[in-house]
Structure formats: structure tokens, C-alpha cells
Amino acid sequence: ASDVYKRQGVHLTHRQLASADSLTVAGLVRLSTVDWPGHMVSTIFLQGCPWNCVYCHNPDLIDCRTPGIMAWADVETFLRRRQGLLDGVVFTGGEPTRQRGLHDAMERAHALGFQVGLHTMGVYPTLLRPLLPLIDWVGFDIKAAPAHYSSIIATDPRSSIGTVGSRHAMESLD
């Protein structure tokens, strides 16, 4: 199953962390009151998702080869101007944990005084685990009951990715 993810360009561990400057930023919501309940945040959308859910509301974020629309340096400059005005930063996607620069970006957001939130599907429990000490809140996107993952996320019904995806999401909940 990990070969499926490797073919999609995913590194399964954070052994080779990258700089936040390597992030492919697909969008920035400057002020959100809905992405983290009870908090005023900025939401950063990261490009790339291993799944193609039938009801995806961000289909433009699926292809990890799509270039970003802004550099992390621009995001960081924006966040510096919002210090004391926002409660936090939420990283979302796509699936943000697939980007190796996420760890550094979260550290930088904390260094600026922001709380850090994460929206994830839990598809990469081995990538999520080392991020947990940096995360103040998680919005966990369970796609379906485990038996129905294949019908929601798999592009090829013969693929085992639905079973693997369900198992990984449930493992991430632990």
C-alpha cells in the first residue's frame, strides 16, 4: 500500500524535513471565523491530495504538480502584519501533511505568536504523528464509514487505496 503513496510523490516520514519556503501554497484566506471554531484565523491552503473524492469541494487542489499561487515568504509577511489581530493559522488543503515544509511552517507560525490548526484526512499517520506537538487544534475529515471509503476516495474501484485510506485515517485517530 505504501507503494501507492510513493508513486504519488509522498514521503512517508519526516526524516528529510524541508523549509517552509518549499511549500506549494494554493491559497490564503486572510480572515476566517469558520475554519477553527471560536477562533479568528488565517487559513492557508496547500496544494496536493492523494484522493479524488466524489464530493471534493477543492478539486483544483488535488494535483500536486500544480504550482502554488504565492510564496511562503509572502504568507509569512502577511502573518507578521496580523500579529495580535488573529488567534491562529489553519493549514488545510488538499492534504497538507504531504508537504515536507509543513513542520517548519508550523514552527514559524508559532514563533510569530499564532496558535496552529490543521485540517487533515489522516491519510498519512506517519507524517501526522511528528506534527502533533506543534498543533493546537485538529479538524479531522473522516470521509465515510470504513467500509465505504473505496466508493468515496478511489479513482479506480479495483484499487486498494480505499481500504488503505480508511485504515490510515482510523490509525490517525488513535
Residue ranges and their predicted role:
Residues 17, 64-67, 154-161:
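Pocket-edge positions in alpha/beta enzyme catalytic cores
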Residues 9-23, 67:
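Extreme N-terminal tail/first-helix region
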Residues 93:
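Short glycine-centered, acidic/aromatic-flanked micro-motifs in structured strand/loop junctions
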Residues 59-89:
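Conserved alpha-helical substructure of the radical SAM core
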Residues 17-40:
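Short, charged low-complexity linear segments at domain edges
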Residues 76-88, 97-174:
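Conserved AdoMet/S-adenosylmethionine-binding subsite of the radical SAM
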Residues 1-5:
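Short, small-residue-biased leader/transition segments that mark boundaries at the very start
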Residues 34, 38-71:
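Canonical Radical SAM [4Fe-4S] cluster-binding loop centered on the CxxxCxxC motif
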